[in-house]
């Protein structure tokens, strides 16, 4: 296998990407194509499933051919994907019965509220690790069955298939032969029992979803089948599947209990490996399956922050304070601190661990001396404060003190932000040389399944440090900063409470 590579397919919310990795875990080739976001009504978000497939197949071929290679050079394919996004298709024709309903879509929020009012939240959380929310796949499937003419009848006859994006891609890559998913994607549907690792009959009955629609659930690293499409002339093993954040956790080599990664993107996604037992959160985090390799199942706690890098985009597009996102570090560095200014970027409410949908963005502590530099610094600081809130909840739930934070995503390139994050945490923030950890995780899962890499120790040894940020702020100053942030969050919540 000297001249072979692993192809990682990274199907995201706004684009489909493909990357070729060599045996040392280096990126050899990359291709990307954006696709259309469909907004039929306020709060609704859809994708065209055929466009998801065509863009993903297209970039897969492009990543290979632009290096002068062909399908015979690909040892295996690993897939990672936007999670929860729901596709239902006709088994006979292979055609979707409706657009993909995206994870951001809120059309089933009222139905979720009615389930909560029936007192079902504790039961659902105990089985799935998830709160009842329109974010997850279950109520999206139910909506399609209730609103697409003929869908429920076809589903009862076993003629419809449901899948998250990974299932849809495998179905198409195998010319409609394989209907599978992996445990990580299944664990985000709100239909999968994370303890028994099976589809939950009681939840299926509760939501009136026929079991015949659901894919077979497999490990995250095994040979599921082989490609049969015209994208590649040769048959390539499909050998790794994981949801995007799970793949990033694996790509960061957070393979032992207590290891944590934070992906700094438009929002932040923090995930902690909690070992071979699920931990039920008492602090509004999500319990999920991290991955499964062979019989070894690892679990995780996850917290999502809605607005992280998006606050920088707001300073650029909404306020005109900067012309490009990259300018924020230099602007913020003009001042040593925010001079008491706090920005709570609750533009879409507050995510974990607060879960306050009504909170709104607020700026506190502004004086006549406040400048655009103070505001820029407050925006960066807010990303670190929000991350600390989630990490504190993770420590409380798990009883594990975090040893270091592994960071990736676009905003992890901001050295000022990473230093402040380390200062607040009191432990090192470490940035790897390869920050494309999501695709790398999918590649590792696929490569391990076929013996391209011998074992976990071999891939672990490939993780390489780019830069380590060690805490340097005095503890008393950290305490003062945190007290101000907590006061600002309380004030943002109070502003949203119109009963006061």
Curated annotation (Swiss-Prot):
InterPro entries in the cross-refs: ATPase_NBD (IPR043129), Carb_kinase_FGGY (IPR000577), Carb_kinase_FGGY_CS (IPR018483), FGGY_C (IPR018485), FGGY_N (IPR018484), Glycerol_kin (IPR005999)
EC numbers for this chain: 2.7.1.30
Binding site for glycerol: 83-84, 135, 244-245
Activity: how regulated: Inhibited by fructose 1,6-bisphosphate (FBP).
PROSITE patterns cross-referenced by the UniProt entry: FGGY_KINASES_1, FGGY_KINASES_2
UniProt pathway annotation: Polyol metabolism; glycerol degradation via glycerol kinase pathway; sn-glycerol 3-phosphate from glycerol: step 1/1
Binding site for ADP: 13, 17, 266, 309, 410, 414
GO molecular function, one term: ATP binding
Biological process annotations from GO: glycerol catabolic process; glycerol metabolic process; glycerol-3-phosphate metabolic process
SUPFAM superfamilies membership: Actin-like ATPase domain (SSF53067)
Key words, A-Z: ATP-binding, Glycerol metabolism, Kinase, Nucleotide-binding, Transferase
Reaction equation(s) it catalyzes: glycerol + ATP = sn-glycerol 3-phosphate + ADP + H(+)
One Gene Ontology cellular component annotation held by this UniProt entry: cytosol
Signal peptide: none
Entry function: Key enzyme in the regulation of glycerol uptake and metabolism. Catalyzes the phosphorylation of glycerol to yield sn-glycerol 3-phosphate.
PANTHER family registered for this protein in UniProt: GLYCEROL KINASE, SUGAR KINASE
Family affiliation: Belongs to the FGGY kinase family.
HAMAP family, A to Z: Glycerol_kin
Protein name: Glycerol kinase
Organism of this sequence: Burkholderia vietnamiensis (strain G4 / LMG 22486)
């Amino acid at each position: 296998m000297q001249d072979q590579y692993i192809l990682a397919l990274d199907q995201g919310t706004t684009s489909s990407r493909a990357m070729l990795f060599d045996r040392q875990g280096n990126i050899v080739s990359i291709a990307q194509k954006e696709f259309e976001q469909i907004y039929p009504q306020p709060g609704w978000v859809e994708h065209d499933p055929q466009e998801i497939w065509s863009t993903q197949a297209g970039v897969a071929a492009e990543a290979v051919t632009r290096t002068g290679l062909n399908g015979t050079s690909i040892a295996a394919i690993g897939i990672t994907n936007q999670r929860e996004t729901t596709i239902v298709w006709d088994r006979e024709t292979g055609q979707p019965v409706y657009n993909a309903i995206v994870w951001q879509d809120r059309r089933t929020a009222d139905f979720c509220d009615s389930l909560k009012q029936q007192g079902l939240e504790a039961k659902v959380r105990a089985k799935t690790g998830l709160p009842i929310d329109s974010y997850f796949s279950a109520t999206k499937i139910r909506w399609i069955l209730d609103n697409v003419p003929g869908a429920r009848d076809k589903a009862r006859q076993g003629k419809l298939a449901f899948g998250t994006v990974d299932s849809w891609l495998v179905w198409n890559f195998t010319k409609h032969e394989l209907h599978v998913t992996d445990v990580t994607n299944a664990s985000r549907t709100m239909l999968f029992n994370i303890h028994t690792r099976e589809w939950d009959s009681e939840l299926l009955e509760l939501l009136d979803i026929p079991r015949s629609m659901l894919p077979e659930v497999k490990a995250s690293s095994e040979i599921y089948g082989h490609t049969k499409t015209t994208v590649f002339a040769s048959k390539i093993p499909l050998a790794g599947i994981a949801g995007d954040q799970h793949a990033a956790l694996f790509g960061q080599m957070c393979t032992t209990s207590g290891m944590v990664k934070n992906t700094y993107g438009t929002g932040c996604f923090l995930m902690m490996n909690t070992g071979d037992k699920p931990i039920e959160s008492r602090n509004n985090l999500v319990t999920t399956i991290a991955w499964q390799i062979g019989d070894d199942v690892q679990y995780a706690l996850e917290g999502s922050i809605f607005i992280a890098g998006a606050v920088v985009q707001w300073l650029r597009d909404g306020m005109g304070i900067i012309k490009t996102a990259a300018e924020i570090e230099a602007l913020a560095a003009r001042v040593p601190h925010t001079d008491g200014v706090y920005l709570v970027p609750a533009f879409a409410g507050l995510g974990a661990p607060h879960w306050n949908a009504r909170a709104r963005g607020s700026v506190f502590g502004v004086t006549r001396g406040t400048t655009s530099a103070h505001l820029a610094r407050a925006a960066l600081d807010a990303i670190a404060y929000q991350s600390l809130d989630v990490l504190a909840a993770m420590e409380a739930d798990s009883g594990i003190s975090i040893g270091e934070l592994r960071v990736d995503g676009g905003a992890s390139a901001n050295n000022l932000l990473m230093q402040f994050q380390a200062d607040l945490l009191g432990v090192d923030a470490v940035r790897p040389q390869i920050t494309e950890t999501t695709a790398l995780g999918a590649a590792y899962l696929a490569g391990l399944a076929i013996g391209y890499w011998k074992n976990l120790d071999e891939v672990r040894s490939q993780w390489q440090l780019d830069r380590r940020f060690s805490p340097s702020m005095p503890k008393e100053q950290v305490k003062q900063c945190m007290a101000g942030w907590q006061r600002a969050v309380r004030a943002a919540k109070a502003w949203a409470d119109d009963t006061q």
